[in-house]
Amino acid sequence: MNKRAKSKNREPLRKSPVKRGDEVVVITGSERGKRGKVLKVLRNTHKVIVEGIKMVKKAVRPSQDNPKGGIVEKEATIAISNVMLASKWEKRQEKKKVAVEKKEQG
């Protein structure tokens, strides 16, 4: 078990609501409304890495892959509770739209 997950008294996820490759929408936070593809699900820490979301800059030492080193932009983790499947999100938005139209009509 991961130390970080252990310190928060969390059990690893048995069944994740999203899987690698799923299209998701961020539902809360500074990246709200943005879409992306799930690259990795971290079950021990209840987090996901989504393509193009929450980009951070990281200093990298020179290596064989990157002989110059420097600063690299990469995706950071997001809490799994802050993302929702895109299909589910669209259904939710459609439902809200219909409710608003009914309210306006009478």
UniProtKB/Swiss-Prot annotation:
Pfam families: KOW, ribosomal_L24. One of its GO terms (cellular component) is ribonucleoprotein complex. GO terms for molecular function: rRNA binding; structural constituent of ribosome. Residues 8-20 have a biased composition (Basic and acidic residues). InterPro entries: KOW, Rib_uL2_dom2, Ribosomal_uL24, Ribosomal_uL24_CS, Ribosomal_uL24_KOW, Translation_prot_SH3-like_sf. HAMAP family: Ribosomal_uL24_B (MF_01326_B). One of two assembly initiator proteins, it binds directly to the 5'-end of the 23S rRNA, where it nucleates assembly of the 50S subunit. Belongs to the universal ribosomal protein uL24 family. This is Large ribosomal subunit protein uL24. It comes from Methylacidiphilum infernorum (isolate V4).
